Structure formats: structure tokens, C-alpha cells
């Protein structure tokens, strides 16, 4: 690993330069840790003070208050962070409204990066209205760069040949957890090849889920060694829930981390994000502990923590990466 946390790396052919690691704010939000706004904002400020300059959110994360408060705390001091956001909008009107909503919520005139969120196989044409809204927002100076986040190899391949696409935010980790091609599982090697193709085409690439939604945290350095050494990747987006998490990544990138160090994950629990769960039932037969069942209320997966042994097999089986550990 050669990049220090204070290094700045160009994203593709844009004029945006980011730290080798970014701060994904989803984990601190209401769907996971539910940190108080002041606490979360202080954590963001701490990360920025350590050298991180890249923050990722999304319309449905409901985490904008943390970022806005952090910017207020900074009061213009230091380097202005690069902010990325995303929308699940499918048509022009929804996407245009989402961009305005995000600008207001974040308290900024221009969002650095704005993406179509979780673009799946075959959806680019279906969501073309939303894509046009992103293009118009860029032309109007409301966003600086546009693209998509995705878990799908074929989407990365498709976007590599879309001239107006500046940025791709794909999922990749050494275990291949959550990587898809169409309706089937794909491998980390498949995604590596797609990323290399997109990078060669001038797309700016930063990646998600290096730690598999927390399920690979017990293999922290192995997972990060893989994530930070992928060809064509400018930055790796990680979630942080406390200062110690940030100190760990600083130590890792500075090369001062002990080779045998791994974070303590004994207090973490496997949980289902019901905003992503589709109730497909793929996770149930792989749980040898019988800890997973369907909720009578909404038909989505639930985990009985008294029976769960945190083996993580369910997370590996989940086709939509709805099972996380925190």
C-alpha cells in the first residue's frame, strides 16, 4: 500500500481529487447505529482532520444532517470535502427533485458527485429519464460529475461505454460477497475485469463493501489489502462508527499497523436491512443454527440473535447484500 490518507487521487477524467479512503455515512444513520446528529457530525469532522476528504451519502440514507452539521462545525476551515450522493429515482421528474432535495438537505449549491443509486442489470434504459436529469443538472452547474453505483458486473461493463458517465461506484471485496451479473452471482475476478475496463475508458472508480458489510471485518487487513490494490480504483469507501475505526484506517494506510492486528468484532451482530431485503428466502437454508425466519408482519427475513453464531454464511448467500454486521 503506497497511498497515505492525505494523498489526493484524481477520479478518472474529472477534476475531482479524493483521499484513498472515503467516509460512507450510512452506518451512522437511523437504519444502523442511529447516532445523535452532533455525535455523527463530530465523527465526520474527526475523519476530515485526519486527512479524509471524501464523504458518501444517498437520498434514502437520511444522513444529511450529520454532513450539514459537520460542515457548519468546520466553518470553512481546512479543505472542502468532496461529497457524493445518490438517488433511486427512475424518471426525470423524480431525479430532478432528488437533486434539489439533496442540495437543500446538505446546504450546498453544488454536489460534487451525483449517482443513480444501485443500478441493476437492464435498468439503464428503464431509468434513462433519471439519467437525463443528472446530465441536465451537471450542465446547469448543480453537480460536477455523474454516474451510478452498482453491485452488477454487467452494469459496470455497460457504463464503461457511456460517454456522459464520469463515475462508477461498484461493489467489490476479496470474497466476492454481493457481486452480481444479471440474476446470478458473479466473482470478484469478474468485477476486477469490469473495473479495469471502465478505468481504461476514463471512468473514475471508487468502490464499496471492501469489508462485506462488516462480515469480513475479522479479516480486516486481508480485505483491505485486496481492496486497495485493485487496478483502476482511486478510492475505497468505508463506514465508520467511532473514532477507533478511523484510527485503524489511518494506521493501516500509514503502514504503522501491526501485521497481526484485526479489530475486535465480538460485540457485532448480524442484522437484516429491511430496506434492501426482498424476502427471497435464500439465507434461510444456509443457516445451520436455524436463526433466520420470515417476519409475519412483512414477509422479510429476521434473525433470532439468541441462536445466531455470527458465522456470516447468510450474508454470503444473500443476493442483494441485505445482511450486514455491525
Residue ranges and their predicted role:
Residues 26-38, 84-93, 216-218:
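Active-site mouth loops of central-metabolism enzymes
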Residues 48-49, 162, 191, 195-257, ...:
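Conserved short secondary-structure transition element at the edge of the structured enzyme core
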Residues 11, 23, 47, 55, ...:
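Conserved, mostly hydrophobic/aromatic
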Residues 53-58, 84-85, 144-148, 206-208, ...:
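Short catalytic-loop micro-motif centered on adjacent basic/acidic residues
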Residues 79-82, 165-173, 257-263:
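Short hydrophobic/aromatic-enriched beta-strand-loop microsegments
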Residues 1-79:
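N-terminal binding-site loop/beta-alpha segment at the start of enzyme catalytic domains
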Residues 31-32, 68, 90-206, 212:
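Glycine/proline-rich, positively charged
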Residues 260-279, 291-310, 324-326:
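Ferredoxin-like iron-sulfur electron-transfer modules
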Amino acid at each position: 500500500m503506497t497511498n497515505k490518507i492525505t494523498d489526493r487521487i484524481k477520479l478518472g477524467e474529472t477534476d475531482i481529487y479524493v483521499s484513498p479512503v472515503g467516509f460512507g455515512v450510512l452506518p451512522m444513520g437511523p437504519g444502523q447505529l442511529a447516532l445523535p446528529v452532533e455525535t455523527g457530525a463530530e465523527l465526520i469532522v474527526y475523519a476530515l482532520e485526519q486527512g479524509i476528504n471524501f464523504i458518501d451519502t444517498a437520498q434514502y440514507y437520511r444522513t444529511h444532517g450529520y454532513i450539514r452539521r459537520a460542515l457548519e462545525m468546520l466553518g470553512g476551515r481546512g479543505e472542502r470535502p468532496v461529497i457524493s450522493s445518490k438517488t433511486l429515482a427512475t424518471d426525470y421528474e423524480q431525479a430532478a427533485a432528488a437533486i434539489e432535495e439533496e442540495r437543500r438537505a446538505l446546504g450546498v449549491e453544488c454536489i460534487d458527485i451525483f449517482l443513480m443509486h444501485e443500478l441493476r442489470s437492464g435498468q439503464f434504459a428503464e431509468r434513462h429519464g433519471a439519467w437525463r436529469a443528472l446530465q441536465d443538472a451537471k450542465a446547469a452547474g448543480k453537480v460536477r460529475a455523474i454516474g451510478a453505483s452498482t453491485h452488477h458486473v454487467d452494469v459496470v461493463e455497460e457504463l464503461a461505454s457511456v460517454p456522459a458517465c464520469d463515475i462508477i461506484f461498484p461493489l467489490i471485496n476479496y470474497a466476492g460477497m454481493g457481486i452480481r451479473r444479471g440474476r446470478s452471482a458473479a466473482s470478484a475476478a469478474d468485477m476486477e475485469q469490469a473495473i479495469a475496463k471502465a478505468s481504461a475508458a476514463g471512468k473514475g472508480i471508487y468502490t464499496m463493501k471492501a469489508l462485506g458489510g462488516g462480515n469480513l471485518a475479522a479479516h480486516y487487513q486481508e480485505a483491505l489489502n485486496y481492496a486497495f490494490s485493485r487496478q483502476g480504483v482511486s478510492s475505497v469507501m468505508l463506514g465508520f462508527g467511532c473514532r477507533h475505526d478511523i484510527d485503524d484506517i489511518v494506521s493501516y494506510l500509514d503502514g504503522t499497523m501491526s501485521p497481526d492486528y484485526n479489530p475486535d468484532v465480538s460485540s457485532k451482530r448480524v442484522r437484516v436491512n429491511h430496506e434492501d431485503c426482498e424476502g427471497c428466502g435464500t439465507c434461510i437454508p444456509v443457516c445451520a443454527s436455524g436463526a433466520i425466519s420470515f417476519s409475519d408482519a412483512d414477509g422479510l427475513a429476521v434473525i433470532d440473535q439468541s441462536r445466531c453464531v455470527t458465522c456470516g454464511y447468510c450474508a454470503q448467500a444473500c443476493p442483494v447484500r441485505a445482511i450486514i454486521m455491525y
